[in-house]
Amino acid sequence: MQRPAVQKLLLLPALIFFVVVCNAHAETPDPIVIGHPACLSGKYAKAGEQAVGGIEACIRWVNEVYGGVPLDGGKAPLSYKKYDCESKKESVTSLIGRLITVDRVDVVFAPYSSGLTLRGAPVAEGHGMLYMDHGGANNKIFEQGFRYTVQTIGPATSYHMGTLDMIQKIAPDAKKVALAYEDSEFASMVMEGAKAHAQELGFDIVFERTYPKGVTDLTPLLSALKATRPDFILGGGHFEDGQLFNRQMADLNIDVNCLSLIAAATLPAFYKALGSMAEGVMGPSHWEYGVTYSREAAKAAGTRWIGPSQDEFVSLFKDAVGDPDMIPDYHAAEAGAQVLAYVLAVEEAGTLDVDAVREALGELRFMSFYGNWDIDDTGLQIGHTMVDVQWQDGKRVIVWPESAQTGKPCYPMPTFEEKAGGKKALP
């Protein structure tokens, strides 16, 4: 008569064990795996090193500070699976296939650069895999009809929009702009956006000309530009031609109120090479250490904040790369912010289903240490704002937008004669 009671008693420990195991499983879902064909060697190795450091920094923040990704009633940790694509297109395609079919990752982060990102997109699309772009700025990536490609870095056409907005606000009498840039797809895309925005704002484009890659003498172009007497110049393409552009402007004594050069002017090596000639020169950047995006700024703007503060990110980055002297640049910041965007999207979707997460990304609006996030229907980033930096007394100062600036712009910039005499570009 008492055997059933005894049997129940004997079964009780097993039942308790089952419940505990089930609860533990519910509280700790399987890791969410980010796959990445990273540029660890080859021509994009420096940018790739920064990107990996940014990703690992924000993964650590998610796992250790945020507690993981809310999913299935628990908190799922993030895991990171990367391979070296050697900055080669053929490696990108094969590695994306491997990450999806062999490693069974939940999302693929694109490699650095527009070319590599575009090469990998059809592979991810063919597998129905979410493909997040942190380093491909070319707008053409988002004109191919890809459903699963989503951008974190701002598009090339947005590079000089802030520069033009700034000049219109601080110098409403400035009307004449000259465009002189490298004949490359990237620079042409940047200037296409600049030209359209300049016309929208009512500026007169008094000069527009390109120069070939690898140019060694810009004297004929700059002489023709000088004759149009522009108020300001938007130019450049990459580091070497940007440096040449500035140096030969000084040689020809071409003075303008503002000179903004893409790619070159934001690099420390630019000032190191040119010294006082670089004073007052500006350039657009996706992110700079010193921006003022913060939890308080997000609250004031009525938007959600996620992630570490800027200083916390820098500390996490240094730990990730194992170098206490390395400062993260925008390659690290945009890659790290991409981790945060994915985490929020999974949290909002409540599932790892790719279509649900992609839909959540389309509805997402938030701020992080990198700035604002918002994408259009094609996946193109439209929320992030470029920052403009200016060399002032040998230091890079963020001068635009006002919400991120660490100092006021110096406008007009000193003349080359004044700079040769020791005058600094101070507001």
Question: Predicted regions: what is each one?
Answer:
Residues 1-33, 100, 420-427:
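Short, low-complexity disordered leader/linker segments with a strong preference
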Residues 114-125, 230-252, 338-341:
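Hydrophobic alpha-helical
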Residues 249-336, 398-406, 414-426:
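Extracellular/periplasmic periplasmic-binding protein-like sensory domains
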Residues 317-333, 341-400, 405, 426:
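Segments of small-molecule ligand-sensing domains
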Residues 53, 105-208, 257-292:
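Extracytoplasmic ligand/sensor domains, especially the bilobed periplasmic-binding protein
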Residues 25-36, 69-77, 168-175:
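Immediate post-signal peptide segment of exported/extracytoplasmic ligand-binding proteins
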Residues 33, 46-53, 65-143, 152, ...:
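Beta-alpha junction/loop-to-helix N-cap segments that form part of ligand/metal-binding clefts
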